[in-house]
Design a protein with these regions (language model features):
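Eukaryotic scaffold repeat domains enriched in small/polar residues
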Residues: 21-206
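N-terminal secretory signal peptides that target proteins for export/translocation
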Residues: 1-5
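Bacterial N-terminal signal peptides
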Residues: 8-20
Length: 206
């Protein structure tokens, strides 16, 4: 899908949440499907860990690797482990796989509340959207730019703080970086949220 098409879809999705009435549509499942599922478990996580909710995957610009974000084996990265001993801080959430599903890189432990959208720019940098927030832990309501090795290069929004200003976001859900470096963030997940598209320069200026 072209960048222009993806930007257009971001506007459509955000606009649909503004005062729209939900209309139930019956799924159309009779179209031909030329694809087949891969047998077994493709892209297994380390230590036998189960996949949690995964909202989006992204193929690198060179088509050689696949990036995916996992919500800490469940649907939330802020919660208690089964024995009540603490947070899910020790679980990475960002994974890079080769075509065969083998992990090449992983990072992001203790950095996210509810990872949602992801984009890989033309330089191979990985942009991850953290939709929900926790002000006490200073997580969420932001977009984080990583190098391919997991170094934090840029943050958009104020960690853990929801808002509708030039420096804050409220439950952003997706990000897109154009070949020219412009950054578009779809800000707003619930119907009563910000429901806006925010544009930044390549260095994060509003």
């Amino acid at each position: 899908m072209s960048y222009a098409s993806r930007i257009g879809l971001m506007f459509v999705f955000v606009g649909a949440g503004i005062g729209a009435t939900a209309i139930a549509l019956e799924a159309q499942n009779d179209a031909p499907n030329p694809y087949r599922t891969v047998p077994g478990v493709w892209a297994a996580l380390p230590d036998g860990r189960d996949w949690g909710s995964t909202s989006l995957v992204e193929v690198s610009p060179d088509g050689e690797t696949i990036w995916a974000v996992d919500r800490c084996g469940t649907n939330d990265c802020i919660g208690r482990v089964e024995n009540g001993s603490g947070q899910y801080d020790d679980l990475d959430v960002v994974f890079q796989f080769n075509k065969q599903g083998r992990i090449l890189n992983q990072f992001g432990a203790g950095m996210f509340a509810w990872p949602h959208g992801i984009d890989v720019d033309d330089d191979g940098n990985v942009w991850v959207v953290d939709a929900r927030g926790n002000e006490e832990l200073m997580r969420g309501h932001q977009v984080i730019k990583f190098s391919p090795d997991g170094e934090v290069l840029l943050r958009l929004g104020t960690a853990g703080v929801a808002g509708r200003t030039r420096t804050t976001l409220d439950q952003p859900n997706d990000v897109l970086v154009t070949p020219e470096g412009d950054i578009f963030v779809a800000d707003g997940h619930p119907g009563n949220g910000n429901n806006r598209i925010v544009k930044y320069s390549s260095d994060g200026r509003y």
